[in-house]
Amino acid sequence: MYNDNMEDTILEILLLIFVIAIPVLKFIFEYNQYENSSYRQETNNSFLSVYFNKGLNGEYHLSRYLNSFQSIGCKCLFNVYIPRNNGKTSEVDVILFHPKGLFVIESKNYSGWIFGNESNKYWTQVLPVRRWKSHKERFYNPIMQNATHIRAIRKHIDDTIPVYSIIAFSDECTLKDVTVKSNVVVTYYSRLYKSINNIISNSNYSITPELLNQTYEKLSQFSNVDYSTKIQHIYNNR
């Protein structure tokens, strides 16, 4: 009887260690993966700040779908605070610099169902609460939001450079009814690479390496901004 109890206790302890070890190992793996990522190098955001911030976490996961472009020499900027004529700033989530143009990406790390029309000022996120019940949240039209970003960017770059607008939603949500009639791309994180490649394959324009580098250097001064700039941005856009 004593041996049986001892064996049961040992098994329970081993099971407890196993249950604790899995999330710890997962956390360590994710930490190491993040520390070696291009997103970490570009933004200097700490792992914990990204881990606990839904917006930054979405940008990080989105950035991983851009690794194929970065592996061929393309550059990215994240959290770019572009000055506007009115003294305010536009916070751009991601800019991909490609010989075919600039891809300005608005990241939406949302869940639930998404409803929206390009011409409507607000879109709707529907979240399940319990069976037969749901909760609705309105959010500003991301196409209009990104259009503001692009207008701000245009003030700082060569007029001949093509700029493409892409709205990328997390795969945790479903684009239930989204109507877009312009050339703006609304897609999921997982389809981002394919969406950008479709634009690239249909473009006959090419930016010279010199102009592309100049553009990157010019816009990079607006990334990795200090804390006061971020606070001022929030205050100005209340």
Where are the language model's segments positioned?
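Surface-exposed interaction regions that form or flank ligand-binding interfaces
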Residues: 2-90, 97-102, 108-113, 129-238
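Short, flexible, mixed-charge acidic loops at enzyme active sites
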Residues: 114-126
